[in-house]
Curated annotation (Swiss-Prot):
<comment type="pathway">
    <text>Pyrimidine metabolism; UMP biosynthesis via de novo pathway; (S)-dihydroorotate from bicarbonate: step 2/3.</text>
</comment>
<feature type="binding site">
    <location>
        <position position="132"/>
    </location>
    <ligand>
        <name>carbamoyl phosphate</name>
    </ligand>
</feature>
<dbReference type="InterPro" id="IPR006131">
    <property type="entry name" value="Asp_carbamoyltransf_Asp/Orn-bd"/>
</dbReference>
<comment type="similarity">
    <text>Belongs to the aspartate/ornithine carbamoyltransferase superfamily. ATCase family.</text>
</comment>
<dbReference type="InterPro" id="IPR006132">
    <property type="entry name" value="Asp/Orn_carbamoyltranf_P-bd"/>
</dbReference>
<dbReference type="Pfam" id="PF00185">
    <property type="entry name" value="OTCace"/>
</dbReference>
<comment type="function">
    <text>Catalyzes the condensation of carbamoyl phosphate and aspartate to form carbamoyl aspartate and inorganic phosphate, the committed step in the de novo pyrimidine nucleotide biosynthesis pathway.</text>
</comment>
<comment type="subunit">
    <text>Heterododecamer (2C3:3R2) of six catalytic PyrB chains organized as two trimers (C3), and six regulatory PyrI chains organized as three dimers (R2).</text>
</comment>
<dbReference type="GO" id="GO:0006207">
    <property type="term" value="P:'de novo' pyrimidine nucleobase biosynthetic process"/>
</dbReference>
<dbReference type="GO" id="GO:0006520">
    <property type="term" value="P:amino acid metabolic process"/>
</dbReference>
<dbReference type="InterPro" id="IPR006130">
    <property type="entry name" value="Asp/Orn_carbamoylTrfase"/>
</dbReference>
<feature type="binding site">
    <location>
        <position position="104"/>
    </location>
    <ligand>
        <name>carbamoyl phosphate</name>
    </ligand>
</feature>
<feature type="binding site">
    <location>
        <position position="218"/>
    </location>
    <ligand>
        <name>L-aspartate</name>
    </ligand>
</feature>
<feature type="binding site">
    <location>
        <position position="257"/>
    </location>
    <ligand>
        <name>carbamoyl phosphate</name>
    </ligand>
</feature>
<feature type="binding site">
    <location>
        <position position="55"/>
    </location>
    <ligand>
        <name>carbamoyl phosphate</name>
    </ligand>
</feature>
<protein>
    <recommendedName>
        <fullName>Aspartate carbamoyltransferase catalytic subunit</fullName>
        <ecNumber>2.1.3.2</ecNumber>
    </recommendedName>
</protein>
<feature type="binding site">
    <location>
        <position position="258"/>
    </location>
    <ligand>
        <name>carbamoyl phosphate</name>
    </ligand>
</feature>
Length: 295
């Protein structure tokens, strides 16, 4: 069991933490965990202020399968809509003595602020364009199951880098293990403030040459003021089988979802390891709840 309470950012993790969590996740995938009800009599509260299918469902399934009592608060009918401050809402929920609060919110960095007001384990399920640590852990697990080692792998992250919490968490996590990180995006969607990044490209074909791993990102129009046409974007940055031929023959294509077929990826390359990312995401969230369980 980890002595630290919260998983807010990749910087909260050590190499040992990542290896222990992924080891647990592999055990859950293989159904090798001895105590499947390790969270019996524990309470998990899910607070999702942004839409979610994969992350919310997998946290719910993970917690219930481990024996926890799960409360997913419907935000649209919560006291937030009566004008309650988020800080006061968190303090109120904390007073009910849950064991975990899992939060997704549109504001970057807000979860780090809220951590000051809770006594339980706080897990970041995505905060604005800041971080999404459990998605990065799931992606790390997928890559580790397909490649012998992360060190020196050429990983290309392509798409809306500017608004992507998945990109930020993956860059930080994969760099911990020595991956070579390359970004591909239009100039308006790139973020150059990553000291961990090895190269930045504005051409997809140039960027994915000899790539081992290609991670595609959704255009996050909900976080944009304006954007290029979808047809133009796909022509320049959408991945299809012809563009994929520039990568290594055994390259894996990843996408955190939801997929927009015909925008960032064509149907002929969409069904690779993307569903495995979902499957492994569930195992990772079981492992995270297990690893951060209260005494």
């Amino acid at each position: 069991m980890n002595k630290r309470r919260n998983l807010l950012n990749i910087s909260d993790l050590t190499v040992d933490d990542v290896e222990n969590i992924t080891k647990l996740a592999n055990q859950y995938l293989k159904k090798e965990v001895a105590n499947s009800h390790i969270l019996e009599n524990k309470t998990v509260i899910n607070l999702f202020f942004e839409d979610s299918t994969r992350t919310l469902a997998s946290f719910e399934i993970a917690a219930k399968s481990l024996g926890a009592n799960v409360v997913t608060l419907p935000i649209r009918s919560s006291s937030i809509n009566k004008g309650e401050d988020l800080k006061d809402m968190i303090k109120t929920l904390n007073a009910m003595n849950p064991d975990y609060i899992i939060i997704r919110h549109k504001s970057s960095g807000i979860i780090n602020t809220l951590a000051k007001y809770v006594n339980c384990s706080l897990i970041n399920a995505g905060d604005g364009s800041s971080e999404h640590p459990t998605q990065a852990l799931a992606d790390y697990l997928v890559i580790s199951n397909h490649k012998k080692q992360i060190k020196d792998l050429k990983v290309v992250i392509c798409g809306d880098i500017l608004h992507s919490r998945v990109a930020r968490s993956n860059i930080r996590l994969l760099k911990m293990f020595g991956a070579e990180i390359n970004l591909v995006a239009p100039p308006t969607l790139i973020c150059k403030h990553f000291p961990e990044v090895d190269s930045v490209h504005y051409s997809l074909i140039e960027g994915i040459k000899d790539a081992d791993v290609i991670m595609l990102l959704r255009l996050q129009k909900e976080r944009m003021n304006n954007s290029s046409s979808e047809k133009e974007y796909f022509y320049l940055y959408g991945l299809d089988s012809q563009k994929l031929s520039y990568a290594k023959p055994d390259a894996i294509v990843m996408h955190p979802g939801p997929i927009n077929r015909g925008i960032e990826i064509s149907s002929d390359v969409a069904d690779c390891v993307i569903l495995q990312q979902v499957e492994f995401g569930l195992a990772i969230r079981k492992a995270v709840l297990h690893y951060y369980r209260p005494c």
